[in-house]
Amino acid sequence: MKKKLINIFLAGLILSVTGCGNTENNSAGGIQPQTEKSSGDTVQEAEGGEMSEETSEGTNGSGSVTEGTEVYRGFIMDNVLHSESDGDIHYHVHIPERYDGSEPYALFFTLPGYEGLYFQGVGENLYSEDFGFTAQEYVKDMIIVAPQLSDWGETSADQTIALVEYFLKNYNIDRSRVYGEGYSGGGETMSLVMGKRPELFTAYLQCSSQWDGAYEPVAESRTAVRFVIGEEDEYYGSQPSREAYNTLHDLYEKEGLSQEEIDELLVLDIKDEDYFTSQGVAYQHGGGNLFAEDDQVMGWLFSK
């Protein structure tokens, strides 16, 4: 726990240097984590460098892949999708051992904050954030992809879309269970993805971030969105999340949805100061990694 709090503080400190509450929660619910835990933290050689027999070729939604050769806590590290249109896309991937392509699996994409971008070092996204690991406690039959992109703008958004399309084409994926999460700058990137291709996803969890993408496509696709952020987030503040929530809420009202129907699709979850300080965290923005351990937050995502 002490190590985790130190990591949270360091991530927040980096974000504050780089520029990278009263609780409001209009929807509870969600599934509880299952009981299987991750393995140790040691980086190991991947057996034969093999990731999946299906990850060798493709055309739109595909491309050639250079597979990683090391494993960290169940993730094959630093695979590279070579996309003709979007360049080299680095990512880590967790594929359950029992996956053989005969049954459809869920798919989860987790995008990191500034401290986890590729230029910070291979694997820094997994070393500094826990979303990719705690997700495994909720859904066992799920492939988890942790891209390491270069920024939080349009280029990274397009690369994320290309990578999602690749997995949808080359793996047996249950299209009704495709989940996205973005923390800080990763949330900005994923919001751009949502503004471009929301129909790729079932639900999106935006953590300690702001919305940079379009809204209308999200309302049209009915992709569920939850905004979770500290009331006094030191980088973004909570107001951008409130405004994004209100914009989507207004769009749904114009389409004639009832409040009950809107609540199924849209959640504004503002955490007060006590949420962080009671868990030993003084810096709300860096403390966003606590959301990875929050059953209500993560359970909501994987219940959709």
Predicted regions: what is each one?
Residues 140, 219-225:
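Short, proline-enriched alpha-helix->beta-strand connector loops that line the catalytic pocket
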Residues 170, 176-220:
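Primarily recognizes the serine-hydrolase "nucleophile elbow" in alpha/beta-hydrolase
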Residues 113-117, 149-154, 184-188, 209-213, ...:
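Solvent-exposed loop/turn segments at secondary-structure junctions
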Residues 98-103, 152-184:
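Gly/Ser-rich "nucleophile elbow"/oxyanion-hole loop immediately N-terminal to the catalytic nucleophile
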Residues 2-24:
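Sec-dependent N-terminal signal peptides of Gram-positive bacterial secreted proteins and lipoproteins
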Residues 228, 232-236, 242, 253-304:
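C-terminal catalytic histidine-bearing segment of alpha/beta-hydrolase fold enzymes
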Residues 105-107, 111-161:
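Active-site machinery of serine-nucleophile hydrolases
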Residues 20-107, 188, 193, 254-264:
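A domain-start/cap signature at the N-terminus of enzymes
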